[in-house]
Amino acid sequence: MSSIVIVSGSRTAMGGFQGSLSSLTAPELGAAVIRESIQRAGVKPEQVDEVIFGCVLSAGIGQAMRKAGVPDHVGAVTINKLCGSAMKAVLMASDTLKAGSANIIVAGGMESMTNAPYILPKARGGYRMGHGEIKDHMFLDGLEDAETGRLMGSFAQDMANTKGFTREQMDDFAISSLKKAQTAITEGYFKEEIVPVEVKTRKGVEVVDQDEQPLKANLEKIPTLRPAFSKDGTITAANSSSISDGAAALVLTTEEYAQSHGLNTLAKIVATSTHSQHPSEFTIAPISAIQKVLERAGWSVDEVDAWEINEAFAMVAMAPIHELGIDEAKVNVHGGACALGHPIGATGSRIILSLIYALKRLGKKKGVAALCIGGGEATAVAIEI
């Protein structure tokens, strides 16, 4: 069976909540990276067999592939696996290619958390009289547990307590992430992966081509921030990921197709995994997902040259580092979501793309990307360049 390869990819800069990308919808962000990734792959839009894209907050947003100029005959599907949506899109693309059901698939994710609407649950039937309720789509379908209504961060706080991670440890991890991201931005490490996006403002058209939040952060304030999820808690806005806007796409095909059509290969997908446990334990689910993907790849922890473990909360990345003996210096080498942000439907493909370019810059070969998913799940991908 021919291996599955990634032949191109791109992402937008990560925009802050109500920040630089706030005037663009998720499909507009998605269209930018779909269009750019197809162009970078050196294929024509009509050669694409399917677009598989993640998006969590999809109420009323429309379609990205149409805005990207992909022809009408190309199929498309939207994936909602919460924070794992974009990585699941990549996993589904890989499986579809393995089955021989397609030759070229664009996979990734998009999210404009800024533009997530508010919902009127009883509007269709009529409120008749009395007080009504407006629900926040972002909270209801993105940041809250479906069964209990608790915020995801409250579960992270519980697990941080269970694992004994202190405020100082999590703040130090977040500060390290922020410093790495700031260095990556100032040194231009992200330039290859980012597609500039034009945004219309009152002053004219502005080009957004740099992650918005890391250079705005004040390192000195991090230890002074109030707990976010409990009065005496240790998790804060700084050692958590920030609400963000962005998109990332990858073009996948088989190694055989790439070779026969003269396409350059960025990376090969060596193995994938999905893991689930109790919903309250989603923050440590990446540990088992990583173990599974390493077993399937036939790799040891020490053989992996670089890791992208999504920092939904600092403790999510810290847990596998401690449990599996991962060298922290190899994790999120250009910073993670505590610094860059976490547009929930896009992060899964963003971290794969960033991992590819980190390996490329470092002259290394093997990498693993993993993230936690609300509901108790996690996914992981092992790649080789």
Regions found by a protein language model. Give the residues of each.
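Conserved catalytic cysteine-centered active-site region
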Residues: 55-104, 146-151, 216-242, 323-350, ...
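Active-site-proximal alpha-helical scaffold in enzymes
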Residues: 79-111, 160-189, 249-256, 321, ...
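N-terminal extracellular/periplasmic Venus flytrap/periplasmic-binding protein-like
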Residues: 10-12, 23-32, 40, 169-260, ...
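Condensing-enzyme catalytic core mediating Claisen C-C bond formation in acyl metabolism
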Residues: 1-27, 36, 219-284, 288, ...
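Flexible glycine-/small-residue-enriched beta->alpha junction loops
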Residues: 104-159
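Conserved active-site "lid/cap" helical segment
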Residues: 1-68, 75, 155-167, 177, ...
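Active-site pocket-lining segment
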Residues: 52-53, 155-157, 193, 200, ...
